[in-house]
Amino acid sequence: MRRHRGPDGAEPEKRDRWRRHELWPASAIEREEAEGVEFRLAHHRLVSGARSVKISARILHVDLDAFFVEVCRQRHPELRDVELLVVGGRRDQRGVVQSASYGARRFGIHAGMPIAQAVRLCPQATFFQGSFPHYREASQAVRAVLQRFSPVVVMASLDEAYLDFGGTDRLYPVSLLPVAESIRDAVKETTGLDCSIGIGPNRMIAKLASDSAKPRGLMEVRAGWEQGFLAGLALSAMPGVGPKTAARWAELGLTDVWQVQQMDETALARRIGADARGLKRRALGHGGTTLHAERLPKSVSRETTLSRDLRDPEELEAILFLLTARVAGQLRDEGLVGRTVTLKLRHDDFRTVTRRHTLELGTDLDGEIWQAARALFQQAFDGARARNRGVRLIGIAVTNLGVAAEADLFEPEDRRRRRELTAAVDKVREKYGFSAVTPGAILRTRRRDR
């Protein structure tokens, strides 16, 4: 384990001087054999310093462990003891892994890996196609539990959330670990899902703490001890540092956060350029401290990897239409509208093209999103046809989101009628399944392929 130093850089043997308190009697605490000021009991961790520091924020980050895998296992208990790989779209060699069980991760498999590569690493793995409605249902159940503990709950994604405990110093003067333990147990009891929880003075520290605590762990990093905690991390663990960036910096001799902490910003800029300022701030533990309870998601999107490379625009438009309908349906389910439509095409040479268009008004209607998506597709596909390139992946996203009620106040009559028709279609699909209502253009394409 990497060394955690105190706020003044003192060595670990002096750690007892830094501790403000212990959560449990000393006899109950198992000190880590490695150096540092981490104390563990049943996978609880506390990182704290001796200096009296006023806590400006107390944020919890709740991260559900192997969420997509565990939701599938709840509905299919026979998958409990197998190396399980959940795929979002295709289950053949052209698809990608959406989530891997912890057993499968031991073979080096991770989210986003092509299925063909995952099969080579773990031939005995079982593949399962996930269900977005099931994920959404489980995520909403978790959110309901979290709202019992804090009035400010921000779902960063389906499987992670931030909770604001600012101003609770008198209620919880020593530590928030007991609260985190109660949250973890309540989530497990209510939903059957495990989670890890990180606590920190800002969002970044809280998230990195939950990452360090996985699986089913708890970690608290006190204000004033951010740098000591971060010093033990690799740069690749930091937000905004992807694999390619980490590899490029490693070639320059930068692999660990403590190296960045010790460099002045000018010297760092000479090595990595314009990223120096932001990286330096993160390495010193600076991060956002505010949460907005009603923060909207950034986008709603769907994409699919095709079973074969396609060059027929009618086939591609049919697939795009279905993806658009799925996106529009999700917007309506979540009470959202969006203004910006983005098309994504990946060609058979793996070149990715995106096109976007911003509408005058936000919408959640299939037809309005489809009209923009089709125009974008025709622009992008003309270029692909000119280069004689097939398409292996197609996707659609809607961004620039807002609350649907705000857009309905001055809706024209013809648009209101389209909304009523859409609501009727939604009811049929809810009762009989999405494919119960299929446009004629899609059916014609299917008949032609027979």
Regions found by a protein language model. Give the residues of each.
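Acidic, metal-coordinating catalytic segment for phosphate/diphosphate chemistry
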Residues: 361-450
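Residue-identity detector for glycine
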Residues: 6-9, 36, 49
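Intrinsic-disorder-associated, low-complexity terminal segments enriched in Asp/Asn/His/Tyr and depleted
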Residues: 4, 8, 16, 21, ...
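Intrinsic low-complexity, disordered N-terminal segments enriched in polar/charged/small residues
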Residues: 9-14, 30-33
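Gly/Gly-Pro- and Ser/Thr-rich, intrinsically disordered tail segments characteristic of DNA damage-repair
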Residues: 18, 38-281, 291, 329, ...
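DNA-contacting surface of Y-family translesion DNA polymerases
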Residues: 54, 61, 167, 230, ...
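Short, hydrophobic beta-strand segments
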Residues: 161-167, 354-357, 403-411
